[in-house]
Amino acid sequence: MDKINNSKTAQHDNVESAPNSGQSLRPVSTDNFESSATDGREGNREHSRMKANRIEMNSINAQRGETKNEAVSMTQYNNLQQQIAMLQMSLQSMMKEKNKQTEKESEEQNNEIAKHISNADINTDTESLVKPQVYIPDKLQKASTSQITDADSHHRSKPLPKAQIDGSLDLVSDNVQGKGPDHSTNENTSVMKTISMQPNTMTASEISEISVGSMDNSVFSVYAQAVISERGVNAIPILRLTDDYKPQNLVNVVANAIPTLFTFHSIHEQKLTSKELEIKPREVYKELTLDQIAQSMDFIKDRTIVVSVVFEPRNLPNFKMSDDDINYLRQVVVLGSQYNANTTVTEVSRRLRNMIMLIANSFVLVKDITKCVWKRKRQETKILTPMKTFFKNDNPHPMLGVRNHAAAWFTKAMIEQFEKYPITIQETETEETVLLKRFGNDCNNRSVYGATVNNTVRLLKGNTLTVDRYLTMVRANAFGGSAIVSQDQGDSGLRVLFYPPRHAWNILLHRMLMSTTFSDTVMNHYVKMISDMGLFTMQDPISFMSLMYQQGNNRDNVLTSIFGAIPKVSEIDFITMFIMEHFSWKYDVIFTSSINITVESAIPEMLSILYTMLFFPKLSQNGMHTLLYRVMLLLRILDKNGMDQLLRQYGAQVQLTPNGQVAELHITEVIDVISEQDARNGLIHAIGYPLVCLDQIQELWTSINEIINRRLPQVILKRKQNANYPYTRDDYVAYASYGNMEGQTVVGTGFEGEFLKYIRMIQSIGKDMFTKVANQSSVSVLNSMSRGTFNTFIMYLGNYESSIPKVVRSLSKVSMLLMNSWGYVHEGYNDACIVTPQRLFGITSGTGRNPPIGLRLKVKNTVNIMTGMTVYIGLEGGTLRPTLSGNLLNASLSIRDTRSIKTVVPFDAVKCTDHGLALAKDCYRFGVAMSTLQYVIKIINARENEETYQYMKDLKSFFMMRTFAEVIDDINTIFKVNLREIMANSVVLEYTSDFRVESLRLVYQARDDIGPETEQGTAFGRLINWKDDIVQDNIHIAAKLMMPDTSPAYLNQKGVILKRYIGQLIKPSLPVITNDMHIIDYQESNMNFKFQSVSETTGVSFTFRDKNNMLRTVLTPESDELINVVLRVGNPGDIHVQWKQFIEQSILDGKLGVIFTDQRYTYKICYWNEASVPIPDQNDLVNTLLYSEGGEYLTIPFIDTSYAKRTSIFTSGVHTYKSFIHPLETTHITGDVITGIFNTVTKPHEFDIAGEDQLGYAYRSQSGIDPNRSPQSGIPKMMNSVPIMNNPINVYTAVPVFDGEINVLVQPPGML
């Protein structure tokens, strides 16, 4: 005591006038003792010893759990003495300022505390020392008129990493905790740390008079400290907290420009070359007329040879054509050899890439288009006269190039075409929706891509977020009974907000079930939202510790056993467990305990398990097999006779049937662990089954069994259903962990009363177990101090009994809010089972017991939860914080919560609603990506009657899962998604994911089953819809443009002729096969045709049957006879390599021709307008074609000399040209729109205007005519084989707000 007094004296000099300052005193550091201890060698020795102990304690803390128990105990003892000295000093200081009676009572009480602690014998028993150390009370602080901060009331010896709500959290220690949003100065708790206690500046009577305002600390709860097993590392189950999810933009907005995929190019005589000219407006026109007309006049000049349509996208954000050599297959090993993909693979890969790119950028909106009025300076043509409205920066069009054209016959021809398909640009039938004007009659340049612009407008028109719809959604994310009103003003008409259609919300459901990453994002959102409310608060159970020490029970092992079962946690810990309770289907729960079962620890651990079952019933049901095992072990310690009777009568385990009946009793006295799979199959420990005669053993066992078999009430999520939020059950039925008290007004009734009944039952169980243990003669450790500890412990718990109704009411309302919200998509609780039936969610292409490829089974996250309870979880509300009172050594003492008042804010229902909308929009984009993948699969699996069959049939076998992954990765990159998040990652089960199927459905499967299951009235078994009609249209548009042989983007063709042709005119459309030619099908076994080597002449004998049925034999190359024979063969690879040299020479000599009917290629037309220059030699190309293996895509240039004779340098004479390569089909061999405008006097015979299928013009919108269909053929324009230029386009003529918000006010229904 002398040492304590010396410390007290030294410390007293440092506090001086602190009691009058109105501020709580900080603990005096040990360094201050060096300057203040001036009492001689005794004080110096005391300081040195304390400093050494402090260093030793820091070393112990760093090692966390190392077996240096004696050092820990000695340090604890010394620190307790120091803190008691500080407390005595503070109390003495206060006595000088207070009346003598108060001073006397305070000093006596604190001296009594010091007496018990200073005289305590430190227990050095190894088993007891490994338990958590006991804390000294730090709640006796000043809290009258001064503001006490959280930092003052929660001192820790060493701060640990803080859990930032809006940052990232990565905790791996089992004693690291987060902190709530309003505890910015609150340090975290370490279980094995000692604490520095703040000196008390108030007497006990003053403490009892504290008024803390209208605050509600009416929560008594339990908490199961969880440890997530992640990659073998245990961590507290706090989700990684990140910033709010920011989805990618779905719609690209193009301002003041018209997007197009095709551009007009023209070739003019003046250039004297075949180079195509890009359209550029001439300066002379800019002063006279509109840019659009100037550009149109610029490329249709007086001496224009040809005007072509070239695939050249413009004004398309984020769209980049891929002309590089792409090979999705790369290098594929086939039958032990390496397959080097040929040009066909490269061509298909390029087309797939560009198709994917086009789909990803197909959601385009056009806005801010400036309208221009045409001002005619003189009489215009019949084409321009009715056109009154133009759009600035629109694309040129041939129709607009006829103004003042020098060739009158050309203007007349264009007018005749116009009269067949009349057009206007004025707004003739304008339909307005949210300032959206739809022009169905403009004649601006429109490609098929224009339809995608219209589809985006259709998407917004059909899925606009209205105020009423938004209010319904907000109501689902708010507390029941909240008043929700819109504060929007009259400007709401300018707002264009996208509301994701139903299938997008269903995709959100699928991603929640299938993607761990996505579901973690959603859970993280709810953790943050509830944390931001500031509703929950946590406090260490120091008050109870104070009571124990005031009773002198510091030597009691029961005390450390009790607090060994009470982990120290934060608000975030509790909120995270609360969220996990609502997503219990996501986890495989394994309850564990780090406490060795002893007589002292068995009772508090049993109570902690029962509280866990009560407050977290869904998680408990998920891991009930591990809880029951622990209960059986505890009961064997607490009531051995009762356990022996149970084992003799029922056995350790009971096998249940699927309907819950007893199938078999396992009569054995061995209490073994039940595996998870056996538990899911109905094997449980006997204590968990509602046995009829259990009350014959003891009423205690019946109470425990009743808590285990408690069932949750069923609720219907009406607000969720009204908001059309996704849910796996059609009836929107769920089970409420805390009942449904949204409409309840009377406190303590209904579920509140039932919950209170179980709280009292648990308290009664604790008393009964203690009595039973105390009466066992073999138990000698439970002395009078232990009895006092247990009695105070039960009394402490009982003090909060009156708070339970308010606690359950608050938990119920928050729980019902979560279940009605958009993220709660599945109910994991089963009221017919003790242990939740295990379900693995999957995606498959079928529903049978033996499904085809495509099954994806989700392996759940395993969560290890350490059972434990917290006896002081608070709700901030509107009533007084409770007071804990008790008879403490005949002294009346009340301990109040002196924490600072924390502001409570309502749940932000608007923010939660907006977050759900953002995720649903992202799911819409995710669905577009998945639909694209599905269409790629369809292309790869093309059937014989489909356009892509021919060039995909040989490649299909190479698209194995490994090579197909290249396509998936490309889609992920282009769409900025991750389709792999819903694909298989299981190495445990035999099923693997293969998404090379065209239709998928959601299924579930029991872990021990052999096939997927479906369920009526649920989402399980239904086909997954990844898209709507608009997405389907956009995919068809992109696929039609990119993939088939009729693609206008690539000018593809099938069939090529190798034959010498000599003439004045060479043109791809001219036939080179005449009637006098002998066409013979090439077959090696054909008796009417064969090649044979002739050794005598080193030549080849060629025998064939002519049209007169006469066999003819020709010796080549010696023979000069023109046999006029054309061989017809599928691909060059079908010809034996032995004869290819002979055939090649015969083609060049003009003696033989070859038709390759199946050869596919991309062509281009070279317009030769230099008559004096020979056309390029084609010998090398003939060789390349002939020696190819077939099935390869080649680029073939066709020569057109139609306009060579019109050049200015060639005026007389006759020139002939020689060509060897010609198309088999000449019908659609050109992409020209207009040809032959080189004579201003008379119309040349070469002049031609493309038909409607290539240069269709806009037409008047009439009733019954679909503006997206051709008026003549009636077929959809996007299905035509070549681009249509007159698709009507929708533009925003005002400036709408695409990313605005609806102002909503939410008023919660009174106090929670």
Curated annotation (Swiss-Prot):
Q: Which residues form a coiled coil?
A: 74-121
> What is the native source organism of this protein?
Diadromus pulchellus idnoreovirus 1 (DpIRV-1)
Q: Which UniProt keywords apply?
A: Coiled coil
Q: Does the keyword DNA damage apply?
A: no
Which top-level group of life is the source organism from?
Viruses
Q: Which gene encodes it?
A: S2
Here the segments flagged for biased composition (Basic and acidic residues) are 1-15, 39-49
Polar residues compositional bias, start-end:
17-38, 56-67
Spans annotated as Disordered: 1-67, 145-167
Its name, as the record gives it, is Uncharacterized protein S2
